[in-house]
């Protein structure tokens, strides 16, 4: 019983690899299209300058955090500084 299960799984694995290789050959390699796709999505990968770091965002000093937030010394994130008002 165990041998038949192992043989069945092996055959299914070989069929999967064979079908994947045939599909890749039919469609062509995705690696040729990758650089164009990355260039079109370039703005996503660029870091944006923001006015201030919002709640739980990373920081190195208090001036980077938005109003009423301060930079915590231990994990360096912006958290509420306990103040209220506009």
UniProtKB/Swiss-Prot annotation:
Keyword Disulfide bond included in the entry's annotation: yes
GO cellular component, one term: extracellular region
Record lineage: Eukaryota, Metazoa, Ecdysozoa, Arthropoda, Chelicerata
Protein family (similarity comment): Belongs to the neurotoxin 10 (Hwtx-1) family. 37 (Jztx-31) subfamily.
Alphabetized InterPro entries for the sequence: Huwentoxin-1 (IPR011696)
Notes concerning its domains: The presence of a 'disulfide through disulfide knot' structurally defines this protein as a knottin.
GO molecular-function term, one example from the UniProt record: toxin activity
Cleavable signal peptide: 1-21
UniProt tissue specificity: Expressed by the venom gland.
Propeptide segments, given as residue ranges: 22-50
Disulphide bond pairs: 52-66, 59-71, 65-78
Keywords from the named record: Amidation, Disulfide bond, Ion channel impairing toxin, Knottin, Secreted, Signal, Toxin, Voltage-gated sodium channel impairing toxin
Residues annotated with Phenylalanine amide modification: 84
Protein name according to UniProt: Mu-theraphotoxin-Cg2a 3
Predominant location: secreted
Subcellular location: Secreted
Primary role: Inhibits both peak current and fast inactivation of voltage-gated sodium channels (Nav) channels. Inhibits the inactivation of Nav on DRG neurons (EC(50)=1.77 uM) and peak current of cardiac myocytes (IC(50)=0.90 uM).
